[in-house]
Regions:
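Tandem repeat scaffolds
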Residues: 1-137
């Protein structure tokens, strides 16, 4: 079982330029090297992407519902139209990400260790809740 998902992860990493629209739901991709991957319209529902390298990935209209992206490197990734409902972004690096909105983040889970792009301001309230504000770019 373990060997199967490691082999699958390596196959996906090797074809990272050809993942547009691919169904990767429930995929176990912990620590995957998917920097600059084209994941446009990919189904990543409930995928495990813990500590994955997704720098400069194209996540345009990707479905990341319930995806676990904790501690993933998503710097400079494109989130245009991406679905983040119930996704987990705890400790993720979103520095330099583009097209990420407060509306998307309202549906996601994250913590104080999550790093946001400069145009997104998260204000944590005393009761543990947060408010999101987008700066004009």
């Amino acid at each position: 079982m373990l060997e199967d998902w490691i082999l699958r992860k390596k196959e996906i990493e090797a074809s990272k330029d050809k993942l547009k629209g691919v169904d990767l739901s429930n995929a176990k991709l912990m620590g995957a090297k998917l920097d600059e991957a084209d994941l446009t319209e990919a189904d990543l529902t409930a995928a495990y992407l813990i500590k994955a390298d997704l720098r400069k990935a194209r996540l345009v209209r990707a479905d990341l519902t319930q995806a676990v992206l904790s501690e993933a490197n998503l710097s400079d990734a494109d989130f245009e139209g991406a679905e983040l409902m119930d996704s987990f972004l705890h400790g993720a690096n979103l520095k330099g990400a583009i097209n990420l909105t407060c509306d998307q983040l309202e549906l996601a889970n994250f913590d104080k260790q999550t790093i946001f792009p400069d145009y997104i301001n998260i204000h944590w309230t005393a009761d543990g809740y947060w408010e999101c504000q987008e700066n004009e770019t």
